[in-house]
Amino acid sequence: MTAHRDTRVNRNHFANIFLLLLCACAAAPGPAVHDKLDSKTGATVSVLPEPVELLTSGYIGVHTGAFAYLGPFELDQMGARTLYLWVLLPHDVSASVAPVIHCDDAPVTLPLQPAGPGNMGLAEPPYAPPDPWGAQWYFALDDPTLTCFARAHRITIDVPNARGELMRFTAESAKDVAGFPVLETFAERRGTKGL
């Protein structure tokens, strides 16, 4: 009788281990999209947990920024939802020439929002700038471009530096992964068509 009970306990133990291993193999959910309330305007802003970081391809000196950042954000003002793209460039690149953004090898044409966050109904930028002296740019973003970014193998930003030399900042998708999961999660959450 004791041997029968030991076998049953062992079976339950093995079943629990099997279920634990099976659950461990399940895919983890993508990074969450954050919603925050602009306290001065009452608008809801949906953003990524962190903006996408782009790295420059060459050495640009110790006193210059080696990173650029971009992040989509959605502004919801009393049910009117508008999609934008926030771009931050290092402080030493030209703040007077709009950057050229590429999805894989194709340049994307996005309307520039020249007045900054105040004209869009925000009291402060959607992302906390990692480089507080960097140049911030805002663009109107559409669903096809967001889909392209989500599925891209490479996103690049070209912009001249203060000396007029072209600087390129690049983000590449992880090896053996098609696209940027964080951007795909953002696009899926807002119901972007074409994914």
Predicted ranges, named:
Residues 44, 107-109, 165-166:
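Short, solvent-exposed loop/turn motifs
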Residues 95-120:
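Extended low-complexity, serine/threonine- and proline-enriched intrinsically disordered segments
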Residues 91-94, 108-109, 130, 134:
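Mature extracytoplasmic domains of secretory-pathway proteins
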Residues 28-97:
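An ectodomain-focused feature that recognizes extracytoplasmic/extracellular
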Residues 114-195:
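Internal interaction segment
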Residues 39, 103-105, 159-164:
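Short acidic, glycine-rich loop/turn motifs
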Residues 23-24:
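C-terminal motif of bacterial Sec signal peptides marking the signal peptidase cleavage site
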Residues 3-17:
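Bacterial N-terminal signal peptides that target proteins for export
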